[in-house]
């Protein structure tokens, strides 16, 4: 048993529907993110991409290819279990939830204005951090560094910041030629106590890169991961500005022009 593999996680989050559209961001599939929004709430950001070319969209194809590569990884095992009364009860409970949602949002099954309610993009590109269950090359951070080379203004939103020397060098390099702003949770407001508390140790080093740091005192923790480059590029997905996202976990980000 390779115990080191326990440390590597699949951290990307996406939903593909009928080769027509997909939803991608940082939102987990539990009650904090998808529940009734009455307790334990986290605020997040997702991107809905609607493909008008009937399955020929570049980013949609990239995402489907990525899924199949993950599915075929040697570390992936198919779980087969016998149907039990427990599963039947859960299924019935989910049906009841769906019926209640139909009452609140009666256009769930009939809504069709996807093209009208979305904004056309010049180009959407999927970037990832590698799929192997092992230490990864920091592909997402390197791509962000490349995209910001000629930028005048860069805004990074992340739940928290935990960097090593290389990552600080990247931030320093950005702030040398651009106005760099980092938006994160205040320590007392974040939902990840380990990540947010370490900010107290990291704060001086972050400020020494030349970045302006804004600590959010929202009613609810913010789980958003995004980079805005000038007034043109948005980079949104699952990548936190920390060493786990940079070197260990699978991550996906959309670059939207």
Describe the predicted segments one by one.
Residues 1-13, 17-257:
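Charged, low-complexity intrinsically disordered terminal segments
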């Amino acid at each position: 048993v390779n115990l080191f593999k326990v440390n590597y996680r699949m951290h990307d989050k996406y939903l593909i529907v009928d080769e027509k559209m997909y939803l991608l961001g940082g939102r987990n599939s539990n009650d904090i993110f998808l529940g009734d929004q009455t307790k334990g709430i986290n605020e997040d950001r997702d991107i809905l991409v609607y493909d008008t070319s009937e399955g020929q969209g570049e980013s949609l194809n990239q995402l489907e290819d990525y899924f199949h590569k993950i599915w075929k990884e040697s570390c992936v095992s198919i779980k087969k279990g016998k149907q039990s009364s427990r599963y039947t009860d859960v299924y019935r409970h989910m049906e009841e939830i769906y019926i209640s949602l139909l009452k609140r949002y009666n256009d769930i099954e009939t809504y069709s204005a996807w093209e009208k309610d979305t904004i056309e993009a010049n180009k959407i590109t999927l970037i990832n951090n590698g799929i192997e269950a092992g230490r990864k090359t920091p592909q997402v951070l390197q791509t962000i560094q490349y995209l910001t080379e000629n930028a005048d203004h860069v805004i990074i939103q992340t739940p928290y910041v935990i960097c090593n020397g290389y990552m600080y060098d990247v931030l320093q390099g950005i702030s040398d030629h651009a106005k760099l702003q980092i938006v994160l949770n205040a320590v007392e407001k974040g939902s990840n106590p380990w990540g947010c508390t370490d900010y107290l140790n990291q704060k001086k080093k972050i400020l020494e890169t030349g970045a302006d740091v804004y600590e959010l005192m929202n009613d609810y923790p913010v789980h958003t991961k995004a980079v805005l480059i000038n007034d043109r590029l948005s980079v949104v997905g699952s990548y936190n500005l920390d060493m786990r996202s940079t070197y260990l976990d699978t991550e996906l980000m959309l670059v939207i022009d």
